[in-house]
Regions:
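Short, flexible, basic/aromatic active-site loop/helix in glycosyltransferases
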Residues: 1-5
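Active-site donor/metal-binding and catalytic loop motifs
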Residues: 49-69
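Terminal low-complexity segments of carbohydrate-biosynthetic enzymes
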Residues: 67-187
Length: 187
């Protein structure tokens, strides 16, 4: 399912408003993975599709942030990995330190194997390729798999989602009227 999306981490998605009531939206950089897994959980697969709206895709990139794990791609990769651990656990996957180390080792080996391929693609397309920085990035992401896994194991009660609208409406039955009133009073 996840592998079928071309830009699963792009940050752009759309859905019909009737789906919104049951979806729990993640409150961190795991947004896209969390949303896709919520859609998978709540919808039949033939109601899900990807649409390319442009021939060119210009995504605004984050800095790598090698020195500050609370920012940039370092923070993003940590949150995304933790999101994947959480979601896989909801499908019955069991995690341990050993399993997380195995996932990190598999990621690291696959990433290293792809470096040569990406470098060749860059050369063929006249794009500069910084092999050293690419390898540093791979090492950072591998470390973040371990740290995200450790966070997941040591904080099992974390609530990473914003409550679904169905839950909000059950706690505050007139929430939608209050929101309309708030918007009207600002307008």
């Amino acid at each position: 399912y996840m592998d079928s999306f071309k830009y699963a981490l792009s940050g752009e998605f759309a859905f019909q408003k009737d789906m919104l009531s049951d979806i729990r939206i993640p409150s961190d950089w795991g947004l896209e993975m969390g949303m896709l897994s919520e859609i998978f959980r709540n919808q039949v697969s033939n109601k899900v599709c990807q649409v390319d709206i442009s021939d060119f895709y210009d995504h605004k990139h984050q800095v790598m942030s090698f020195d500050d794990k609370s920012k940039g791609l370092s923070k993003m990769s940590h949150d995304i990995a933790k999101s994947m651990f959480r979601k896989m656990a909801t499908f019955g996957e069991v995690f341990s330190e050993e399993r997380i180390r195995t996932i990190k080792a598999a990621y690291y080996r696959i990433a290293l194997d792809l470096v040569d391929s990406y470098e060749s693609d860059a050369i063929m397309n006249g794009i500069s390729y910084d092999r050293h920085n690419e390898l540093k990035s791979i090492e950072l992401f591998a470390q973040n798999i371990i740290s995200a896994g450790n966070d997941f194991l040591t904080h099992p009660k974390d609530m990473p989602f914003i409550p679904s609208w169905k839950r909000v409406a059950s706690a505050v039955p007139d929430i939608f009227e209050k929101m309309i009133d708030a918007v009207d009073s600002d307008y």
